[in-house]
Amino acid sequence: ALVIAAHPGFPARDLGALLAAARARPGEIGYATSGNGTSPHAAGEMLWGRAGVRLSHVPYRGSAPALTDVIAGNVPVLIDNIVSALEHIRAGRLVALAAMTG
């Protein structure tokens, strides 16, 4: 399963609010993943396309650097494996917006 999570300073607290923000600011909101062509990247692009919004993909070379940059506030949103992000969500370093399965 994947999770869409955000830095605690990002105003969205659920997927609907993220999509509304993306509609208001097309292409201005970045989302980090573990790299181009990965499952999180593909899932994000499919979701944004179906929702009719545009977010800017920020690819990293693995999950750890993506998590680090979102926690630091350098990128506002992350799509990652829920196992990798769960500890940070529980600690309040990330806010879970939605889970993706299937």
Residue ranges and their predicted role:
Residues 14-15, 40-41, 78, 87-90:
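Alpha-helix N-cap/helix-start motif
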Residues 1-65:
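Hinge/capping helix and adjacent helix->loop/strand transition within the periplasmic-binding protein
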